[in-house]
């Protein structure tokens, strides 16, 4: 019988052969790769080199329910390099109990890719903040699973004085508030002190008894790693420092290959 009579194209058979040689462990196939659709497995075979990387993307796809286009976006934006093996700067391990500290580190990325923000030379923090809020669907996709957006310029009244947080989230996996502050320039030590204060205020005003300690994330255009490490060393609250990139800073080939706004929004609505 012709192989096409059985519904298998030559291309599909080649992928099946490649799949079998790539994953010789039958138990891995049954318990891990079988959790995601065949088209997703094909995308990972095509685009991901290395056993650890492939397994990581398979597990993340199953965990997050990524569509085919979103999976490709995550691969081409280098999510494994930015989240799984990045040299992240934070004081989470010394300020949070286990396993909360490990989960917080795993959740963090460096850099964050805001490919939906058109770069302008005269952009200030508020411009970036507004652009992120306007496309909150894509912002949540980049931040990762479990994030719920609570507001921007979130007002806190502390002893009669007014303070405003750039972006406030609650993470359902971490079970804590996440305060994000945006900076258009290089990291400065005083930014950590300001965020430390905001976290104290959030813990005092918003945090409930069953919530974990709030976490802060400083997103800067650039950072001196050693300066950031020293700045966080004596901060009392858990804080991470990451860089971010916008559209004009991405390689042209990558920018062309990213999924459309419609693709991402359809995926989020479907979930």
Where are these regions (language model features)?
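Basic, low-complexity intrinsically disordered segments
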Residues: 4-271
């Amino acid at each position: 019988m012709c192989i096409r009579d059985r519904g298998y194209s030559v291309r599909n058979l080649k992928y099946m052969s490649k799949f079998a040689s790539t994953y010789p462990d039958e138990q891995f196939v049954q318990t891990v790769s079988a959790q995601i659709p065949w088209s997703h497995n094909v995308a990972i075979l095509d685009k991901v080199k290395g056993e650890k990387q492939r397994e990581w993307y398979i597990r993340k796809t199953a965990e997050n329910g990524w569509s085919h286009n979103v999976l490709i976006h995550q691969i081409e934006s280098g999510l494994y390099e930015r989240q799984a093996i990045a040299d992240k700067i934070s004081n989470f391990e010394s300020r949070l109990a286990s396993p909360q500290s490990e989960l917080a580190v795993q959740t963090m990325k460096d850099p964050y890719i805001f490919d939906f923000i058109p770069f302008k030379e005269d952009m200030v923090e508020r411009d970036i903040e507004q652009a992120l809020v306007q496309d909150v669907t894509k912002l949540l996709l980049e931040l990762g699973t479990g994030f719920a957006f609570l507001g921007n310029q979130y007002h806190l009244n502390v002893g009669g004085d007014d303070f405003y947080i750039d972006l406030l989230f609650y993470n359902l996996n971490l079970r804590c508030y996440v305060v994000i502050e945006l900076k258009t320039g290089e990291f400065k030590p005083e930014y950590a002190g300001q965020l430390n204060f905001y976290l104290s205020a959030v813990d005092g005003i918003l945090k409930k008894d069953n919530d974990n300690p709030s976490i802060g994330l400083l997103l800067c255009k650039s950072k001196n790693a050693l300066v950031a490490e020293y700045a966080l060393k004596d901060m009392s609250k858990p804080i991470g420092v990451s860089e971010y990139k916008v559209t004009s800073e991405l390689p042209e080939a990558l920018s062309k290959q990213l999924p459309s706004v419609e693709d991402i929004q359809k995926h989020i609505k479907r979930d």
